[in-house]
């Protein structure tokens, strides 16, 4: 999965897809626990416009057009949407409300109340393992609305918190248990594109866990990767996805000797909730 990073304005969608992305990541900013804008703000990755934005409902409806056969904008390659939920300042109760409201808005504007809605898989990326109630609120809302089937298309990622330290894999696993999540688990690791690479120790530990007999992780992605050398290292370690500001760079590496025979772009037929090789 090549994940176009920080795609928050409608005009950025085709740009990222034309460069080779088959997945997109959006930043969802909340107002009174309601998803209101796709917006990141400053600071953000180097060489990027941090203040591009759109109303969330408009963006979700546009994503539906890009991922529903029959629309003029439909792009078969776009198979995964990662919603980076900016809920870091919420307590668990507020996060639950945010989960309820996110479910309602996606149901209405992206899934079109399950009537010819968007077909892409969805990952909810949550910034704090303490906010496990967000997932509960999201899942219970879709069930209450009579659309539990849509949960087959939804996965989850706890990305933090970053301070004072990132949670351990055991702590992350415990948060998923509290949220009632078994399977459909993505794990992210990485830093901004201007940060030093480091030794990828946490990434390697996560991949080892993913591949173990009792691992709880299904897929792992690394961000924000813009340099050829970093892409090569991430692929050699064994990531499932790469989040990038330059999808064409990833495409180039995938075509290199040593990689083109081992990796290919994911398609809609590849289940993002299945651990490769298991």
Curated annotation (Swiss-Prot):
It catalyses: an N-(acyl)-sphingosylphosphocholine = an N-(acyl)-sphingosyl-1,3-cyclic phosphate + choline; an N-(acyl)-sphingosylphosphoethanolamine = an N-(acyl)-sphingosyl-1,3-cyclic phosphate + ethanolamine; a 1-acyl-sn-glycero-3-phosphocholine = a 1-acyl-sn-glycero-2,3-cyclic phosphate + choline; a 1-acyl-sn-glycero-3-phosphoethanolamine = a 1-acyl-sn-glycero-2,3-cyclic phosphate + ethanolamine. Mg(2+) binds at residues 25, 27, 84. Its main location: secreted. Keywords: Cytolysis, Dermonecrotic toxin, Disulfide bond, Hemolysis, Lipid degradation, Lipid metabolism, Lyase, Magnesium, Metal-binding, Secreted, Toxin. GO terms for biological process: killing of cells of another organism; lipid catabolic process. InterPro entries: PLC-like_Pdiesterase_TIM-brl. GO terms for cellular component: extracellular region. Dermonecrotic toxins cleave the phosphodiester linkage between the phosphate and headgroup of certain phospholipids (sphingolipid and lysolipid substrates), forming an alcohol (often choline) and a cyclic phosphate. This toxin acts on sphingomyelin (SM). It may also act on ceramide phosphoethanolamine (CPE), lysophosphatidylcholine (LPC) and lysophosphatidylethanolamine (LPE), but not on lysophosphatidylserine (LPS), and lysophosphatidylglycerol (LPG). It acts by transphosphatidylation, releasing exclusively cyclic phosphate products as second products. Belongs to the arthropod phospholipase D family. Class I subfamily. This is Dermonecrotic toxin Ls4SicTox-alphaIII1ii. It comes from Loxosceles sp. (strain 4 GJB-2008).
